[in-house]
Amino acid sequence: MPVLLGIPLLLRFLGFLLVTLFGYLLTFLKKGFGKIAIAISLFLALIIGLNSILVGYLSDISAQLPSDFVQGVQLILPSNALPCFYVILSVKAAIFIFDVKQKIVSYLDWDK
C-alpha cells in the first residue's frame, strides 16, 4: 500500500522533467541551429530511405519473375548488371533529393 502512495509524487516528478526538457527543446528550436539541424536530418533520412526503398523494389522485382525468363536474361546481361542498376537508380534518386535540398537551403537562407 505505501507503494501506491508514492505514484502521484512520481508522476508529478516525471511531468516536471518532461515539461522542463520540452521547454529546453523549444528554446533550442527557436534558434536557427535547430532549424538547420532538423533540415539536415530530414535530408539525410530522405536519401537513405529512398535508396533503401529502390533497392528493395529491385530485389522484389527480380524475385517475382518466372524462372525461364530469369535464365534467358542471365544469358544476355553481365553478372554485375544488377549492382549497376542499383547505382544508376541511386544516382537518379540522389539528384532528385539534391534538388529538394536546394529548396531546403533556400528556405534556410540567413537573410530571411
From Swiss-Prot:
Q: What is this protein called?
A: Head virion protein G6P
Q: Which residues form the signal peptide?
A: none
State the oligomer form and interacting partners.
Answer: Interacts with G3P; this interaction is required for proper integration of G3P and G6P into the virion.
Q: How does it sit in the membrane?
A: Multi-pass membrane protein
| Tagged with keyword Transmembrane | yes
Function, please? Plays essential roles both in the entry of the viral genome into the bacterial host and in budding process. The formation of the G3P-G6P complex termed adsorption complex is essential for correct termination of filamentous phage assembly.
Family stated for the protein in its record: Belongs to the inovirus G6P protein family.
Keywords from the UniProt entry: Host membrane, Membrane, Transmembrane, Transmembrane helix, Viral penetration into host cytoplasm, Viral penetration into host cytoplasm via pilus retraction, Virion, Virus entry into host cell
- The domain of life for this entry's organism is Viruses
Q: Where does this polypeptide localize?
A: Virion; Host membrane
Give the record's GO CC terms: host cell membrane; membrane; virion component
Native organism: Enterobacteria phage M13 (Bacteriophage M13)
Pfam families for this protein: DUF5455 (PF17537)
Primary site of residence: virion
The record, for InterPro entries, names: DUF5455
Q: Where are the transmembrane segments?
A: 3-23, 36-56, 80-100
Q: Which GO terms describe its biological process?
A: symbiont entry into host cell
